[in-house]
């Protein structure tokens, strides 16, 4: 954030995986330690931020909370009369967040895909929060992991169709935005400064081992929705950023099997996760590899 010189930061995410990246590197903690206020702008993430809870799903981060719990939370945090209707809760959050957008020095988004052909970053949302975050503050920072890079725009839009259909059952999300650099002299709006942070954080090591197929993951969350273990336990039981079958494979790679060794055992090997995966990642096979590694190291 030194390059931005920000006093107030707004964070928005192109998808929940992008939000997960900032959790992976503890970005919010770093910003707060440097007197920069981060504000989540995805509605689910905003709810979790003011409640002090971690997300439980990579697409619907607050799916574990009921409407009544959110009503209680807004009443405590915002004051005023208790709001009972979902539309009223959304309107209250919109009113508060709109002021944060206008006050922000820096907008931080993720990217669902980065296009090598054009140097573009693509975000998809159903709330429009990423679009406001990249367009209103004077500086826009994109944070994305290296497996988000695809060769061409055609490749990106093929994957975007898979992502929307597997994540929310839509043909396309409500907002799909392609960003290619800061605004030009002739542009009336857009950020004056544009930066892309490409995060490795152990992923390049996966290219040379048996878990490289995990890098195909587009973070749709379908594997979680069909996993009997995830449905029974919820996302918080997985203990770190990434829940469900994809987390059971990815987490041991990122934080070490010695820290994440229980996760590959959180599976019935029913195969549903592989069946619904739009990019056909063999998740049961990869969890079995981790179990073999756990046995080899005698981790119990």
Residue ranges of predicted features:
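Short alpha-helical basic/polar micro-motif
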Residues: 117, 225, 275
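Ferredoxin-type iron-sulfur electron-transfer modules in oxidoreductases and energy-metabolism complexes
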Residues: 187-214, 229-300
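Residue-level detector of anion-binding/catalytic polar loops
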Residues: 37, 223, 273
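Short, glycine/acidic-rich beta->alpha junctions
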Residues: 19, 219, 268-271
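The feature marks the mature, well-folded catalytic cores of soluble enzymes
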Residues: 1-210
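Phosphate-binding glycine-rich loops and their immediate beta-loop-alpha structural context
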Residues: 217, 221-224
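Short glycine- and Lys/Arg-enriched binding-loop motifs that mark or flank ligand-binding interfaces
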Residues: 115, 217, 267
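Acidic/polar loop patches that form or flank catalytic/metal-binding clefts of enzymes
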Residues: 151-153, 167-172, 225, 232, ...
């Amino acid at each position: 954030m030194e390059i931005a010189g920000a006093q107030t930061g707004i964070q928005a995410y192109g998808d929940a995986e992008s939000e997960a990246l900032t959790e992976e590197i503890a970005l919010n903690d770093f910003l707060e330690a440097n007197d920069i206020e981060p504000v989540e702008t995805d509605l689910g993430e905003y709810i979790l931020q003011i409640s002090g809870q971690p997300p439980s799903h990579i697409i619907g981060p607050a799916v574990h909370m009921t409407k009544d719990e959110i009503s209680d939370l807004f009443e405590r945090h915002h004051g005023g009369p208790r709001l009972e209707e979902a539309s009223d809760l959304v309107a209250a959050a919109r009113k508060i967040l709109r002021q944060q957008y206008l006050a922000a020095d820096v907008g931080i988004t993720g990217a669902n895909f980065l296009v090598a052909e054009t140097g573009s970053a693509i975000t998809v949302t159903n709330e429009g929060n990423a679009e406001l975050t990249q367009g209103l503050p004077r500086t826009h920072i994109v944070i994305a992991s290296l497996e988000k890079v695809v060769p061409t725009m055609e490749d990106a839009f093929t994957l975007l169709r898979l992502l929307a259909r597997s994540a929310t059952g839509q043909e396309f999300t409500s907002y799909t935005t392609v960003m290619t650099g800061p605004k030009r002299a002739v542009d009336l709006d857009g950020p004056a400064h544009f930066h892309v942070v490409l995060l490795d954080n152990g992923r390049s090591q996966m290219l040379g081992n048996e878990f490289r197929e995990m890098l195909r993951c587009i973070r749709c969350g379908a594997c979680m929705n069909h996993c009997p273990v995830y449905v029974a336990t919820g996302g918080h039981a997985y203990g770190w950023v990434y829940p469900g079958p994809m987390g059971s494979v990815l987490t041991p790679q990122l934080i070490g099997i010695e820290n994440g060794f229980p996760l590959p055992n959180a599976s019935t090997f029913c195969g549903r996760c592989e069946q619904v995966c739009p990019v056909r990642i063999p998740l049961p096979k990869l969890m079995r590899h981790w179990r073999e590694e756990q046995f080899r190291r005698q981790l119990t």
